[in-house]
Amino acid sequence: APVVYIHIPQGAPLETEACRLSIARARAFFDRVFPDYAYTCFFSESWLLFSGNKDFMRPGCNILQFAALFHPVCDLPFPAQTMERVFGAKCRRTEDYPAETDLQRRLKAYLLAGGQPGMGVGYIER
């Protein structure tokens, strides 16, 4: 079935209402410009959608609220995107990752406790 892929720009603010508005605008755009494109949903894969994020992120944070807009499909064991986006670089030892932001501190503690980040796949109904 046809889908519309959602690209999540790095560093974009993930305020829930702004995200809802963006999705509504995308629906209107596709209905107006591509009326014959019978897509079934908006689809994305990202570290932001990983279900395990709830194990270390602050409840109610923008990332978890953003992920809640999606119906989860599955998680994938690919930590590289998380590490790159949160820490900026790959370190050989977990102890060497920076802990300057709340997210960095929380993810580092999660890693040191044996947690494994990943990617999530999800969709938003048309």
Locations of regions flagged by a protein language model:
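Acyl-donor binding region in acyl/amide transferases
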Residues: 2-80
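GNAT-family acyltransferases
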Residues: 1, 123-126
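Arginine residue identity/basic-tract feature
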Residues: 20, 25-27, 32, 58, ...
